Amino acid sequence: MSIRAEEISALIKQQIENYESEIQVSDVGTVIQIGDGIARAHGLDNVMSGELVEFSNGVMGMALNLEENNVGIVILGPYTGIKEGDEVRRTGRIMEVPVGEALIGRVVNPLGQPVDGLGPIETTETRPIESPAPGVMDRKSVHEPLQTGIKAIDALVPIGRGQRELIIGDRQTGKTSIAIDTIINQKDQNMICIYVAIGQKESTVRTVVETLRKHGALDYTIVVTASASQPAPLLFLAPYAGVTMGEYFMYKGQHVLVVYDDLSKQAAAYRELSLLLRRPPGREAYPGDIFYLHSRLLERAAKLSDAKGGGSLTALPFVETQAGDISAYIPTNVISITDGQIFLQSDLFFSGVRPAINAGLSVSRVGGAAQIKAMKKVSGTLRLDLAAYRELEAFAQFGSDLDKATQAKLARGARTVEVLKQDLHAPIPVEKQVAIIYALTHGFLDDIPVEDIRRFEKEFFLWLDQNGQHLLEHIRTTKELPNEEDFNKAIEAFKKTFVVSQ
């Protein structure tokens, strides 16, 4: 067999023509110091702020401090396997999380990885966790109500879709319960809910997940958890991961509710990272950009304009106070960023007023525009009644003789407090809330003993379900009060059947 030189040279030519040389350039640095979840690396000259880097053992890190001759990296995972002299390489990617419908009903960590043991999450899309908030022209003023199902909130401090309402109070005053009840009440309301647990106990998160599952709320909820046992960087990233997952739905024209439970723990985690990165401390040892940490997160809550699809993202951030001190650093920061706050007081909680909302210190700066007309009409005098009652209550303690008007105010106030009490995980539809508050503000409860008010309410709702459906339907569909004469007749008819306890 003869070797044909032309054929061989043609083949070699073809191979040379088809040869593509691809040189992969990757920035590689060396770990020069490691400890407390922070690594310092030398040689990553072109790394971006917030870029993901990969250590030789596969653990990821995030470049936060870009200094003259080294880079400060926070490690997103166990750091015990990393040692001085190890290689660390750039990925060229900014921190991203998976987003999409597949996350609904799942419990994930701040990196979007499932922690509920239900197998992998099939998502095809990711979004960077740091993204700019919608601009002025992309927004619309808040005008649609977000019904929490809690009488004290829907009547006194209403929340609108796209609002940021701070829930503030000491530990164990029922902050998480308010959020869970609000999520449960979003059933059939076309809302996606995201519950972000920051630095909570694993057992607490488990209880929340089971409560949501029991009430069928997990079908439209994503739970993001960075528990107390996880590294500080994950606690710092958790709220951003939650809002990023929510933005995916908001930009598709859907409505989202994000609960951050709680931002004081995120601030503490960020303080820890900053001090370990040797950034200069400020007031209460927090770094100088602690305000920006929360403002850039909460500014991403918005009601989008119709041109942008009309979606909304409502934020319910929590802040834990120490001994009711709302003038501390983090509480005042977050109060100034949000559109109002709901202040929960431990004194009220322990005296049996639950939800323990202090009506005097709680406000909603934009929610009034979102309240339905019927509720606005009936709850107009409620806040003043409560404020007057709290003021007079102190005088009444002295037991001196009080005139008729003062006695009437005290009696109305005591009944108002009773009406605003509510059981746990029992949200009430807005039309029923309007009915009982109408009865209260129009004097129908003035002759009912205070201890019977809760029973009156329960039986009144049952009676309305059977005999007053047309009234409830009218409020539900028109958002207006029904004919006053018909409403009064219905309440009088029920009062005739109600038996006062002896």
From Swiss-Prot:
It is found in: Cell membrane. One of its GO terms (cellular component) is proton-transporting ATP synthase complex. The record marks S362 as: Required for activity. ATP binds at G169, D170, R171, Q172, T173, G174, K175, T176. One of its GO terms (molecular function) is ATP binding. PROSITE patterns: ATPASE_ALPHA_BETA. It is an enzyme of class 7 (translocase). Its EC number is 7.1.2.2. Keywords: ATP synthesis, ATP-binding, Cell membrane, CF(1), Hydrogen ion transport, Ion transport, Membrane, Nucleotide-binding, Translocase, Transport. It catalyses: ATP + H2O + 4 H(+)(in) = ADP + phosphate + 5 H(+)(out). The keyword Cell membrane applies. InterPro entries: ATP_synth_asu-like_sf, ATP_synth_asu_C, ATP_synth_asu_C_sf, ATP_synth_F1_a_nt-bd_dom, ATP_synth_F1_asu, ATPase_a/bsu_AS, ATPase_F1/V1/A1_a/bsu_N, ATPase_F1/V1/A1_a/bsu_N_sf. It is a peripheral membrane protein. Its main location: membrane. Residues 115-138 are annotated as: Disordered. Belongs to the ATPase alpha/beta chains family. F-type ATPases have 2 components, CF(1) - the catalytic core - and CF(0) - the membrane proton channel. CF(1) has five subunits: alpha(3), beta(3), gamma(1), delta(1), epsilon(1). CF(0) has three main subunits: a(1), b(2) and c(9-12). The alpha and beta chains form an alternating ring which encloses part of the gamma chain. CF(1) is attached to CF(0) by a central stalk formed by the gamma and epsilon chains, while a peripheral stalk is formed by the delta and b chains. Produces ATP from ADP in the presence of a proton gradient across the membrane. The alpha chain is a regulatory subunit. This is ATP synthase subunit alpha. It comes from Geobacillus sp. (strain WCH70). The lineage of its organism: Bacteria, Bacillati, Bacillota, Bacilli, Bacillales. The gene is atpA.
